[in-house]
Protein backbone atom coordinates (compact mmCIF):
# COMPACT_ATOMS: atom_id res chain seq x y z
CA UNK A 1 0.00 0.00 0.00
CA UNK A 2 1.23 3.49 -0.83
CA UNK A 3 0.63 6.44 1.45
CA UNK A 4 1.23 10.16 0.87
CA UNK A 5 4.97 10.04 1.51
CA UNK A 6 5.28 7.02 -0.81
CA UNK A 7 3.88 8.82 -3.87
CA UNK A 8 6.46 9.19 -6.63
CA UNK A 9 7.19 12.90 -6.95
CA UNK A 10 9.14 15.00 -9.48
CA UNK A 11 12.79 15.72 -8.62
CA UNK A 12 12.02 19.42 -8.18
CA UNK A 13 9.59 18.78 -5.31
CA UNK A 14 10.11 21.16 -2.39
CA UNK A 15 10.06 20.25 1.30
CA UNK A 16 8.35 22.35 3.97
CA UNK A 17 9.00 22.76 7.68
CA UNK A 18 6.96 24.85 10.11
CA UNK A 19 8.51 27.40 12.45
CA UNK A 20 6.83 26.98 15.81
CA UNK A 21 6.20 29.06 18.91
CA UNK A 22 8.43 28.47 21.93
CA UNK A 23 5.75 29.71 24.33
CA UNK A 24 2.29 28.59 25.38
CA UNK A 25 1.00 32.18 25.38
CA UNK A 26 2.91 35.22 24.19
CA UNK A 27 2.78 38.42 22.18
CA UNK A 28 4.94 38.52 19.05
CA UNK A 29 6.97 41.73 19.35
CA UNK A 30 9.10 41.35 16.23
CA UNK A 31 10.02 38.72 13.66
CA UNK A 32 13.16 38.85 11.53
CA UNK A 33 13.34 35.94 9.07
CA UNK A 34 15.96 37.43 6.75
CA UNK A 35 18.67 34.93 7.69
CA UNK A 36 16.23 32.09 7.11
CA UNK A 37 15.31 33.44 3.68
CA UNK A 38 18.97 33.90 2.70
CA UNK A 39 20.07 30.44 3.79
CA UNK A 40 21.38 28.46 0.77
CA UNK A 41 18.72 26.13 -0.57
CA UNK A 42 15.77 28.00 0.92
CA UNK A 43 13.29 28.95 -1.80
CA UNK A 44 10.78 30.97 0.19
CA UNK A 45 9.57 31.71 3.71
CA UNK A 46 5.84 31.94 4.35
CA UNK A 47 4.07 34.04 6.98
CA UNK A 48 0.50 35.21 7.46
CA UNK A 49 1.24 38.08 5.06
CA UNK A 50 1.63 35.58 2.19
CA UNK A 51 -1.87 34.14 2.54
CA UNK A 52 -4.07 35.59 -0.23
CA UNK A 53 -7.31 34.44 1.39
CA UNK A 54 -8.34 33.71 4.97
CA UNK A 55 -5.70 33.02 7.61
CA UNK A 56 -7.63 30.20 9.26
CA UNK A 57 -7.48 26.41 9.31
CA UNK A 58 -10.24 25.71 11.84
CA UNK A 59 -13.13 23.48 10.76
CA UNK A 60 -15.78 26.16 11.33
CA UNK A 61 -15.14 28.59 14.21
CA UNK A 62 -12.55 30.81 12.51
CA UNK A 63 -10.31 30.72 15.58
CA UNK A 64 -7.26 28.74 14.45
CA UNK A 65 -4.85 30.78 12.30
CA UNK A 66 -2.63 29.05 9.78
CA UNK A 67 0.23 31.28 10.94
CA UNK A 68 0.07 33.27 14.19
CA UNK A 69 0.23 37.02 13.62
CA UNK A 70 0.27 38.96 16.89
CA UNK A 71 -0.40 36.39 19.60
CA UNK A 72 0.60 32.75 20.01
CA UNK A 73 -1.85 30.74 22.06
CA UNK A 74 -0.16 27.37 22.45
CA UNK A 75 3.32 25.90 22.54
CA UNK A 76 4.35 24.80 19.07
CA UNK A 77 1.84 26.95 17.19
CA UNK A 78 2.91 27.58 13.60
CA UNK A 79 4.32 31.07 13.07
CA UNK A 80 5.99 30.68 9.68
CA UNK A 81 7.04 28.02 7.18
CA UNK A 82 10.30 27.35 5.37
CA UNK A 83 10.17 26.02 1.81
CA UNK A 84 13.48 24.46 0.84
CA UNK A 85 15.15 22.11 -1.62
CA UNK A 86 15.31 19.40 1.05
CA UNK A 87 14.24 18.89 4.63
CA UNK A 88 17.78 19.09 6.06
CA UNK A 89 18.19 22.57 4.62
CA UNK A 90 14.86 23.59 6.12
CA UNK A 91 15.85 22.26 9.55
CA UNK A 92 19.11 24.19 9.56
CA UNK A 93 17.56 27.39 8.22
CA UNK A 94 14.68 27.44 10.66
CA UNK A 95 17.08 27.79 13.60
CA UNK A 96 18.14 31.22 12.29
CA UNK A 97 14.73 32.82 12.85
CA UNK A 98 14.91 35.84 15.17
CA UNK A 99 11.54 36.19 16.87
CA UNK A 100 11.08 38.27 20.00
CA UNK A 101 8.19 37.48 22.32
CA UNK A 102 6.62 38.96 25.41
CA UNK A 103 5.51 35.97 27.44
CA UNK A 104 1.96 36.15 28.80
CA UNK A 105 0.22 34.13 31.54
CA UNK A 106 -0.86 30.71 30.34
CA UNK A 107 -3.69 28.47 31.51
CA UNK A 108 -2.33 24.93 31.34
CA UNK A 109 -4.68 22.83 33.47
CA UNK A 110 -8.40 22.41 34.05
CA UNK A 111 -7.98 23.54 37.66
CA UNK A 112 -6.31 26.78 36.51
CA UNK A 113 -9.14 27.39 34.04
CA UNK A 114 -11.78 26.88 36.73
CA UNK A 115 -9.96 29.09 39.23
CA UNK A 116 -9.57 31.97 36.78
CA UNK A 117 -12.94 31.57 35.07
CA UNK A 118 -11.10 31.06 31.79
CA UNK A 119 -13.59 28.83 30.01
CA UNK A 120 -14.38 28.55 26.32
CA UNK A 121 -18.07 29.26 26.67
CA UNK A 122 -21.22 28.65 28.68
CA UNK A 123 -22.05 25.02 29.44
CA UNK A 124 -24.51 23.17 27.23
CA UNK A 125 -27.18 21.59 29.42
CA UNK A 126 -29.12 18.45 28.51
CA UNK A 127 -31.89 17.75 31.00
CA UNK A 128 -34.54 15.06 31.29
CA UNK A 129 -37.12 15.13 34.07
CA UNK A 130 -36.94 16.87 37.44
CA UNK A 131 -33.55 15.63 38.50
CA UNK A 132 -33.15 17.79 41.63
CA UNK A 133 -36.44 16.56 43.07
CA UNK A 134 -35.60 12.95 42.26
CA UNK A 135 -32.19 13.26 43.88
CA UNK A 136 -33.68 14.81 47.02
CA UNK A 137 -36.12 11.90 47.36
CA UNK A 138 -33.48 9.21 46.72
CA UNK A 139 -32.81 6.90 49.65
CA UNK A 140 -29.12 6.65 48.84
CA UNK A 141 -26.82 9.29 47.37
CA UNK A 142 -23.24 9.36 46.11
CA UNK A 143 -21.13 12.13 44.67
CA UNK A 144 -17.57 12.33 43.44
CA UNK A 145 -15.13 13.28 40.71
CA UNK A 146 -13.56 11.30 37.88
CA UNK A 147 -10.32 12.53 36.31
CA UNK A 148 -9.41 11.35 32.81
CA UNK A 149 -6.08 12.16 31.20
CA UNK A 150 -5.72 13.38 27.64
CA UNK A 151 -5.04 11.11 24.70
CA UNK A 152 -2.97 11.39 21.53
CA UNK A 153 -4.27 9.89 18.29
CA UNK A 154 -1.25 7.67 17.65
CA UNK A 155 -1.81 6.91 13.97
CA UNK A 156 1.19 5.22 12.33
CA UNK A 157 1.17 7.60 9.35
CA UNK A 158 1.60 11.17 10.55
CA UNK A 159 -0.14 14.22 9.12
CA UNK A 160 0.96 14.49 5.50
CA UNK A 161 0.21 16.61 2.44
CA UNK A 162 1.65 16.86 -1.07
CA UNK A 163 0.42 19.56 -3.44
CA UNK A 164 0.87 20.35 -7.13
CA UNK A 165 -0.29 23.46 -8.95
CA UNK A 166 -2.13 22.77 -12.21
CA UNK A 167 -3.27 24.99 -15.04
CA UNK A 168 -4.70 28.41 -14.27
CA UNK A 169 -6.02 28.32 -10.69
CA UNK A 170 -6.16 24.54 -10.32
CA UNK A 171 -4.44 22.91 -7.34
CA UNK A 172 -4.26 19.19 -6.48
CA UNK A 173 -3.63 18.09 -2.90
CA UNK A 174 -2.81 14.54 -1.84
CA UNK A 175 -3.29 14.22 1.90
CA UNK A 176 -3.98 11.83 4.74
CA UNK A 177 -7.37 12.96 6.00
CA UNK A 178 -10.72 11.68 7.22
CA UNK A 179 -12.41 14.75 5.74
CA UNK A 180 -11.34 15.50 2.13
CA UNK A 181 -14.22 17.94 1.61
CA UNK A 182 -13.13 20.05 4.57
CA UNK A 183 -9.59 20.12 3.18
CA UNK A 184 -10.99 21.30 -0.16
CA UNK A 185 -12.95 24.11 1.48
CA UNK A 186 -10.13 25.29 3.74
CA UNK A 187 -7.50 25.25 0.98
CA UNK A 188 -9.84 27.23 -1.28
CA UNK A 189 -10.56 29.78 1.47
CA UNK A 190 -6.89 30.26 2.32
CA UNK A 191 -5.78 30.60 -1.30
CA UNK A 192 -8.71 32.79 -2.29
CA UNK A 193 -10.00 30.21 -4.78
CA UNK A 194 -13.32 28.58 -5.56
CA UNK A 195 -13.94 25.07 -4.25
CA UNK A 196 -13.94 23.67 -7.78
CA UNK A 197 -10.34 24.88 -8.22
CA UNK A 198 -9.14 22.47 -5.53
CA UNK A 199 -8.94 18.69 -5.98
CA UNK A 200 -8.23 16.62 -2.88
CA UNK A 201 -7.10 13.00 -3.21
CA UNK A 202 -7.03 10.62 -0.26
CA UNK A 203 -6.27 7.12 -1.46
CA UNK A 204 -5.83 5.68 2.02
CA UNK A 205 -4.85 6.63 5.56
CA UNK A 206 -2.35 5.07 7.91
CA UNK A 207 -4.74 5.45 10.84
CA UNK A 208 -6.86 8.35 11.99
CA UNK A 209 -9.22 7.67 14.93
CA UNK A 210 -10.64 11.20 14.71
CA UNK A 211 -7.17 12.77 14.70
CA UNK A 212 -7.34 13.36 10.95
CA UNK A 213 -10.77 14.97 10.74
CA UNK A 214 -9.54 18.57 10.91
CA UNK A 215 -5.87 18.36 11.91
CA UNK A 216 -4.87 17.77 8.29
CA UNK A 217 -6.09 21.24 7.29
CA UNK A 218 -2.88 23.04 8.25
CA UNK A 219 -0.36 20.88 6.33
CA UNK A 220 -2.66 20.71 3.31
CA UNK A 221 -3.11 24.49 3.20
CA UNK A 222 0.60 25.23 3.63
CA UNK A 223 1.62 22.66 1.00
CA UNK A 224 -0.95 24.07 -1.44
CA UNK A 225 0.15 27.64 -0.76
CA UNK A 226 3.80 26.69 -1.29
CA UNK A 227 3.01 24.95 -4.57
CA UNK A 228 0.94 27.88 -5.78
CA UNK A 229 3.51 30.56 -4.93
CA UNK A 230 6.58 28.69 -6.21
CA UNK A 231 5.08 26.84 -9.16
CA UNK A 232 6.73 23.64 -7.92
CA UNK A 233 5.31 20.57 -6.17
CA UNK A 234 5.58 20.86 -2.39
CA UNK A 235 5.34 18.41 0.47
CA UNK A 236 4.76 18.87 4.20
CA UNK A 237 5.12 15.75 6.34
CA UNK A 238 5.08 16.11 10.12
CA UNK A 239 7.67 14.07 11.95
CA UNK A 240 6.39 12.37 15.09
CA UNK A 241 7.57 15.11 17.47
CA UNK A 242 5.92 17.87 15.44
CA UNK A 243 2.78 15.79 15.07
CA UNK A 244 2.46 15.47 18.85
CA UNK A 245 3.06 19.19 19.39
CA UNK A 246 1.08 20.71 16.52
CA UNK A 247 -2.10 18.68 16.58
CA UNK A 248 -5.07 18.89 18.92
CA UNK A 249 -5.83 16.12 21.36
CA UNK A 250 -8.56 14.35 23.18
CA UNK A 251 -8.11 16.71 26.08
CA UNK A 252 -8.23 16.00 29.81
CA UNK A 253 -11.58 15.73 31.57
CA UNK A 254 -12.76 16.34 35.11
CA UNK A 255 -16.21 14.88 35.66
CA UNK A 256 -18.21 15.84 38.75
CA UNK A 257 -21.26 13.71 39.48
CA UNK A 258 -24.13 13.14 41.92
CA UNK A 259 -26.28 10.01 41.76
CA UNK A 260 -29.37 8.92 43.69
CA UNK A 261 -30.43 5.27 43.91
CA UNK A 262 -32.58 2.84 45.88
CA UNK A 263 -31.54 -0.13 48.02
CA UNK A 264 -32.09 -2.52 45.11
CA UNK A 265 -29.62 -0.54 42.97
CA UNK A 266 -32.21 1.26 40.85
CA UNK A 267 -30.75 4.61 39.77
CA UNK A 268 -33.38 7.34 39.74
CA UNK A 269 -31.30 10.50 39.32
CA UNK A 270 -27.92 11.50 37.92
CA UNK A 271 -26.30 14.91 37.70
CA UNK A 272 -23.01 15.05 35.77
Language-model-derived ranges and their functions:
Residues 40, 94-101, 105, 118, ...:
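Structural signal for hydrophobic packing residues in well-ordered secondary-structure cores
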Residues 18-46, 81-100, 161-205, 210-230:
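Alpha-helical support elements that line or immediately flank enzyme active sites
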Residues 63-89, 210-263:
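Glycine-rich and small/hydrophobic secondary-structure elements
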Amino acid sequence: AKYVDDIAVPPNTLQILLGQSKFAHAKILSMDLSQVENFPGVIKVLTAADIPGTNDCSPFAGDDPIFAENIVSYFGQSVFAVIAEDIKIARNAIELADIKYEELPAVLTIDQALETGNVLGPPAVIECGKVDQALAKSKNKLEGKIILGGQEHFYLEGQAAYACAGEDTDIVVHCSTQHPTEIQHKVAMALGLSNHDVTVITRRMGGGFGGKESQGNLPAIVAALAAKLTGRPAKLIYDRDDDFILTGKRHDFQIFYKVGFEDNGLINSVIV
